């Protein structure tokens, strides 16, 4: 697992208060991890801060799973 993947999973587990083992790449923030729309906005902000990058709104709307976040950040993180 990449360093980015590990960091994303840790951020998600901490922000959503879920067990780390539930945070898999296929896990949907809303359907599987119990996030609401505000949680997803806060996660995007946490990713931006942790990875020192900007996630445009149109890209943020496509980040629905842990794997989506990892793929985006692997391509775009500083």
From Swiss-Prot:
It is found in: Cytoplasm. 4'-phosphopantetheine is transferred from CoA to a specific serine of apo-ACP by AcpS. This modification is essential for activity because fatty acids are bound in thioester linkage to the sulfhydryl of the prosthetic group. One of its GO terms (biological process) is lipid A biosynthetic process. Keywords: Cytoplasm, Fatty acid biosynthesis, Fatty acid metabolism, Lipid biosynthesis, Lipid metabolism, Phosphopantetheine, Phosphoprotein. Belongs to the acyl carrier protein (ACP) family. PANTHER family: ACYL CARRIER PROTEIN, CARRIER DOMAIN-CONTAINING PROTEIN. This is Acyl carrier protein. The gene is acpP.
